[in-house]
Amino acid sequence: MNEDTESGYMSARASKIFQSKLELLKRESNWAGMVKMLKRYAKRYPNEYYVHQQLAATLYVDSIAQFHLAFQYAEHAMNIEPDDDLNIYTYACALYYIGQLEKSFEFFTKIINKDIQEIAYGEHGEGLRYAKQLINDSVYMAGVVCQRLHRYNEAKDYFVRYLENKKPFQYSDFTKRQATSHLSELTNV
């Protein structure tokens, strides 16, 4: 067993190989293959929170829908690195999928209320575009949670805010169509 495996962390070389494999599987939308690979890496590198976070996010993809297992990996990633905003977002999503709506809402609002500069350029930051996307996706999910909790006016406010903040060509896990669909459902309530 090599040194990086014993420490629970990847070497720089192993990390590059991992990222390359991960990106290829994402491009192909090969979710089952991604789960298989990520489980191998999670076992081999238990201290690499990013592996656990990616596995959690993949497990709650519709075609996989292993929500309780996703929660376990998201929780593990949070235990390793509770200050990473992507971990917080993934954990909040996992909480949502297992029905812990109030707690999920707390974590989404934690991201929403965080300073955008800190998200963009802090220890785990990946730039302003990433920070805007993460905050706006959290706004969308806060709307979804409020809708499920029957807090309809609050849900409307979040969906309107999401649409106002959504810029052309800005990446998001969600579409304008999804947000407007939620809004139209809420106008009938």
Label every model-predicted segment.
Residues 13-47, 54-61:
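Alpha-helical segment of the N-proximal tetratricopeptide repeat
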Residues 27, 61-63, 97, 148, ...:
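Register position in tetratricopeptide repeats
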Residues 28-36, 64-76, 98-107, 151-157:
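Structural signature of tandem alpha-helical TPR/SEL1-like repeats
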